[in-house]
C-alpha cells in the first residue's frame, strides 16, 4: 500500500500510532510530504526514523527549509528569527543540545537533499506530491497554500499537498 502524510510537526507518538493503525510494513511505502519537524519536541527523531527506513520518502516542507536557511551553509539573514517564530526552537535545541555534531551534519545533509515535489504513478494513476502548492517555482512548492477552488494544473494527475490545514479548505473546524 502507498501512503502519504504531512505536517507531523514533531508529534512522534501520533506518527507511531499512525504507523501502527495502518499496519505499516516492508511491503508499504510512506511519503512524508514535508514538515516533520518543529512545534513539538520529537521532530529530529521523526527525521531519523525516515532516514533509517528504506520504504519512507520525504519531501521538503517550509519548516525543513527554515531549518536549512538557519543552520545550512548559507545561514540566511533573518532566517533564525523566522524559524523561531514558526516553532523551530524545539528542533534547534534538539539538534544542538541532544545530537552530536556528526549526527547534526548528517541530518542537515539529508534535509538539503530532499526534493520539493515528486511525481509518482500508482496503479496507472499519476500523482504529484508537493508540500505547499503545485507550481513552477520552488517557493510556491514549499510555501504556497491551495484554495478550495484550486484544481490540479497537470492533466490526468491528482495533486496531493500538505501545508494547508484541511479546515481552511472545508470551512469545518
Question: Model regions: which residues?
Answer:
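Active-site-proximal beta-strand elements of phosphoester/diester hydrolases
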Residues: 1-9, 126-133
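Hydrophobic positions in the central parallel beta-sheet of the AAA+
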Residues: 3, 30-32, 128, 159-160
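Core catalytic region of metal-dependent phosphoesterases/phosphodiesterases
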Residues: 5, 10-83
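Acidic, His/Gly-enriched loop-helix segments that form or flank divalent-metal centers
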Residues: 82-173
